[in-house]
């Protein structure tokens, strides 16, 4: 009986993690088309009682990242809270500071990440930093959805080429125009 209760609790916790991560994915999507060359990232900060105390997303390149925006909203309520982030927090200095450092300095107790960042400047270093700071790290929550959200970014980073979408219209017999050359209504 005790094993069932623990198992049930784990399942409920997992469902909660997925619900918060879904919200983070919704936030990230708000920046679609504005973040290049950076990925779309969303972050939700949740206190011990399960209340959302901060939300943020990366609006555009050069501006604060999702984690920093969510921490700014959460303020001191971030202490001991859980951060749900759609992509591994960055670990390098660029136009902004590393998000893994910002999360640690804010006193975040746990970070739940949808997927790892394949960018060689990050590539596991953000999570390693968090673990070294004594922060619990969970990965893979809504991973498939997060990877789909940033297909363009992942293709550029891993394959060194743009993500291409092709639209092709043809007739039922596989042609792109009629015998007369008319392609207006195919």
Which residues does each predicted region cover?
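Short loop/turn microsegments at loop-to-beta-strand junctions
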Residues: 39-41, 53, 164-166
């Amino acid at each position: 009986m005790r094993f069932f209760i623990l198992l049930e609790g784990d399942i409920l916790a997992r469902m909660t993690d997925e619900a918060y991560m879904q919200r983070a994915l919704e936030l990230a999507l708000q920046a679609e088309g504005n973040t290049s060359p950076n990925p779309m990232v969303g972050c939700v900060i949740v206190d011990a009682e399960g209340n959302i105390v901060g939300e943020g997303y990366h609006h555009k390149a050069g501006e604060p990242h999702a984690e920093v925006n969510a921490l700014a909203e959460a303020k001191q309520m971030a202490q001991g809270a859980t951060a749900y982030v759609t992509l591994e927090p960055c670990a390098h200095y660029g136009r902004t500071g590393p998000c893994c450092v910002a999360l640690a300095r804010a006193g975040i107790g746990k970070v739940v990440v949808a997927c790892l960042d394949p960018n060689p400047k990050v590539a596991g270093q953000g999570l390693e930093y968090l673990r070294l700071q004594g922060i619990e790290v969970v990965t893979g929550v809504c991973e498939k959805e997060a990877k789909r959200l940033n297909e363009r970014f992942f293709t550029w980073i891993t394959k060194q080429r743009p993500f291409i979408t092709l639209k092709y219209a043809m007739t039922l017999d596989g042609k792109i125009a009629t015998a007369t050359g008319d392609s207006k209504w195919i």
